[in-house]
A protein has these predicted regions:
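Short amphipathic alpha-helix that is part of the acyltransferase structural core
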Residues: 1-31
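Short alpha-helical
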Residues: 10, 55, 65, 111-112
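Active-site rim helix/loop that mediates acceptor-substrate recognition in acyltransferases
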Residues: 22-51
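Conserved beta-strand in the GNAT
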Residues: 48, 54-62, 67-74
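Active-site beta-strand termini and strand-to-loop segments that position acidic
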Residues: 50-52, 140-143
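Conserved acetyl-CoA-binding loop-helix of GNAT-fold acetyltransferases
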Residues: 75, 81-94, 119
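Conserved GNAT acetyl-CoA-binding A-motif
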Residues: 96-109
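Conserved active-site alpha-helix within GNAT-family acetyltransferase domains
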Residues: 110-134
Length: 144
């Protein structure tokens, strides 16, 4: 189980540090979205999952006029396959629905993330037909 809290300057620094290392070592990850992550932190839309007082994952989301989107969700490579991503996602979904969002969207990039989001109830978005090589757009409607 992780504690999920709005980011602090310290947790932001920790996230950016491991994303930069991941980019350098593997050429993968979300360090390319550094400015989005910092802007989301400044707007209070970056939430970090902590275990043993260390950031093990984070989620960036934003509320729009009617719906909301989860823009980035990543779990530190050393902490994957422990359910932390599901905890971050369900916490973000609950928070967004509690603010009145009628739906939450995600863009599956990489496409290998699609089964994860579908396991949480997300379905293809009709307004974004899936095309080969492009990210899949999924939506989860608030039925409450």
């Amino acid at each position: 189980m992780i504690n999920i809290l709005v980011s602090t300057k310290q947790s932001l620094t920790e996230v950016l540090g491991w994303l930069e290392r991941e980019q350098t070592e593997s050429g993968e990850g979300f360090f390319c979205n550094e400015s989005t992550i910092v802007t989301s932190h400044d707007a209070g839309e970056l939430f970090c999952g902590l275990a043993d007082n260390r950031v093990v994952g984070f989620v960036v989301h934003n509320k729009k006029s009617v719906g909301a989107s989860i823009d980035i969700l990543e779990v530190h490579p050393q902490h994957r396959s422990r359910g932390f991503g599901s905890q971050l996602a369900t916490n973000a979904i609950g928070r967004l629905f509690a603010t009145g969002a009628a739906f939450v969207t995600v863009q599956c990039s990489p496409r290998s993330s699609e089964p994860f989001w579908r396991s949480l109830g997300f379905l293809p978005q009709d307004s974004y037909p899936s095309r080969a090589g492009e990210p899949t757009h999924l939506v989860l409607h608030n039925v409450a």
